[in-house]
């Protein structure tokens, strides 16, 4: 049984900012200021989500919902680059779907072990002043700031990866059956909704092969609308190759097995048409609780009214259980053998060591749309998305950075735009948190 079962959570991931480039100069005789030797900033750490077979619930995320990667270190003198920020690896159960919480877009469905998704990339480290030295600018007092890392709000939804789903009304014997055929240790009692979370069990076919069975908590009419235990567990049978539909043939608690069967099929259809297309094995449980003649009449009645075969078993005594396992395996064996070979191959490789992540980078656009906002009769502010991005990369309080910013803006017609906006000589103009007196 899955202890504290959680199958849907929201988390926030914050990748690391790139480190700032350094402005420094080496000590060298007869060389002004010694020449630039500021190193680059390190890239910010990224955040990666990877699937693992070692987890079967999202319960960890009830207590930790925000994940931050390290920022990159700032560059240093002597052309030493800052250290890159450490990546954060988040492990989730196989079967986890990752959605963008803002757009509801499915980003990835981690259906196999060792699959991964980079959910937030770290920012690129800024270049140090050694990178800006030219024949005309031999003593550059300019360096780039690191780029901010990505920030994402995500929804994680777990859909259990099981080969076989046990479905049926509460108290038809699903928990007894899964405990009989697998290694699952489950709570069994004679009242509805004993099972309130999915139980998983591994059924050994032989020494080489096995398959996973999920005991889905009992369904009732209106489950797709949230009645009973609701539709919260219906998603867990979407991945199953085969549905084993248990019917209580004893009629001890429920009067009509056929009506029960039809009602559950309607619930599956209301939730998803895909569920109706899955292979279904109908099983009449609790045959030990009725005499032979009554059993034959009820099995015949079921066949006549539904047109479908029904296989009799007793989960309690074990009668016909091995035959049921053989029947299930015959339907899933080919697909399962290929899947297990694929899983074993993936488990032999540590894929996260091979991940190459391109950090978030921003090269200022040479073509910037400039807007001027009048704050009062003598004060104006230069604004625009391109300007904000430009200011995010360079420190306008550094002389050479300021010249680079102003030259870029002038190439985009800053003076003309200021004049057309009514800016006069002596007025104050703000660019970010830097201000200057306007002189045409």
Curated annotation (Swiss-Prot):
Query: Where does it reside?
Result: Cytoplasm
Name the SUPFAM superfamilies on file.
Obg GTP-binding protein C-terminal domain, Obg GTP-binding protein N-terminal domain, P-loop containing nucleoside triphosphate hydrolases
- Superkingdom as given in the UniProt entry: Bacteria
Disulfide-linked positions:
none
Give the family this protein belongs to, as stated in its UniProt record. Answer: Belongs to the TRAFAC class OBG-HflX-like GTPase superfamily. OBG GTPase family.
Function of the molecule: An essential GTPase which binds GTP, GDP and possibly (p)ppGpp with moderate affinity, with high nucleotide exchange rates and a fairly low GTP hydrolysis rate. Plays a role in control of the cell cycle, stress response, ribosome biogenesis and in those bacteria that undergo differentiation, in morphogenesis control.
Record protein name field = GTPase Obg
Look up and give the organism this protein is from. Petrotoga mobilis (strain DSM 10674 / SJ95)
The organism that produces this protein has a lineage beginning with: Bacteria, Thermotogati, Thermotogota, Thermotogae, Petrotogales
């Amino acid at each position: 049984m899955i202890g504290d079962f959680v199958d849907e959570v929201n988390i926030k991931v914050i990748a690391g900012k790139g480190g700032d480039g350094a402005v420094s100069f080496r000590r060298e005789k007869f060389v002004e200021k010694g020449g630039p030797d500021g190193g680059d900033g390190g890239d910010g750490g990224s955040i990666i989500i990877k699937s693992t077979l070692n987890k079967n619930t999202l319960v960890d995320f009830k207590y930790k919902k925000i994940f931050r990667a390290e920022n990159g270190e700032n560059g240093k003198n002597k052309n030493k680059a800052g250290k890159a920020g450490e990546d954060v690896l988040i492990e989730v159960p196989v079967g986890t779907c990752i959605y963008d919480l803002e757009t509801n877009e499915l980003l990835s469905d981690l259906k196999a072990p060792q699959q991964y998704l980079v959910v937030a990339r770290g920012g690129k480290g800024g270049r140090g002043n050694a990178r800006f030295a030219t024949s005309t600018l031999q003593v550059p007092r300019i360096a780039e700031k690191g780029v901010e890392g990505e920030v994402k709000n995500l929804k994680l939804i777990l859909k259990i990866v099981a080969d076989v789903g046990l479905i049926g009304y509460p108290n038809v014997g699903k928990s007894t059956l899964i405990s009989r055929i697998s290694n699952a240790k489950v709570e069994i009692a004679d009242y509805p909704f004993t099972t309130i979370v999915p139980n998983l069990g591994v059924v050994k076919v032989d020494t080489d092969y096995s398959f996973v069975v999920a005991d889905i908590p009992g369904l009732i009419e209106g489950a797709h609308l949230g009645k009973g235990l609701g539709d919260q567990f219906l998603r867990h049978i979407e991945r199953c190759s085969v549905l084993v539909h248990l019917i209580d043939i004893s009629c001890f608690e429920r009067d009509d097995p056929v009506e029960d069967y039809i009602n559950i099929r309607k619930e599956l259809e209301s939730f998803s048409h895909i569920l109706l297309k899955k292979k279904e094995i109908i099983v009449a449980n609790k045959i030990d609780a009725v005499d032979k003649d009554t059993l034959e009449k009820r099995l015949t009645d079921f066949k006549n009214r539904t047109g479908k075969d029904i296989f009799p078993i007793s989960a309690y005594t074990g009668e016909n259980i091995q035959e049921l396992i053989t029947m299930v395996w015959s339907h899933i064996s080919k697909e399962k053998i290929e899947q297990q070979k694929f899983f074993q191959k993936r488990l032999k490789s540590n894929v996260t060591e091979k991940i190459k992540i391109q950090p978030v980078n921003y090269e200022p656009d040479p073509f910037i749309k400039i807007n001027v906002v009048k704050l009062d009769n003598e004060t104006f502010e230069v604004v625009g998305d391109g300007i904000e991005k430009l200011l995010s990369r360079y420190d306008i309080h550094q002389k050479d950075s300021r010249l680079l910013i102003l030259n870029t803006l002038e190439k985009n017609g800053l003076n003309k735009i200021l004049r057309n906006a009514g800016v006069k000589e002596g007025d104050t103009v703000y660019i970010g948190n830097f201000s200057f007196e306007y002189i045409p």
